[in-house]
Amino acid sequence: MKPSDAIRGEEGGIRRLIEAYGFIEPKLFGSAARGDDHEGSDLDLLATIPPTMAGKISLFDIAELEEELQAMVGVPVDLHVCNNMPEHLRQSIEREMVTL
């Protein structure tokens, strides 16, 4: 199944799950956001760690969240943290990202 098809109707649940882990501003980017995804593509998501949660969200939390999201939508999920991203990469992503 294409990621763009897998998330159809699940956007609210995806957003709530990401926010339950303490992240804010969840966004979709990559091939699913551009509409050129295919079966076998992963789902690229971007979220921000707010200042109040700095140092409280671990890599284990991120991995666990990715697993929960994958179970929810049935396709591989790659969650990127905006705070840790180089500026040039974030600017590139911002051109195609879609708010969930």
Q: Where are these predicted regions, by residue range?
A:
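Catalytic core of pol beta-like nucleotidyltransferases
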Residues: M1-E25, A33-G35, E39, T52-L100
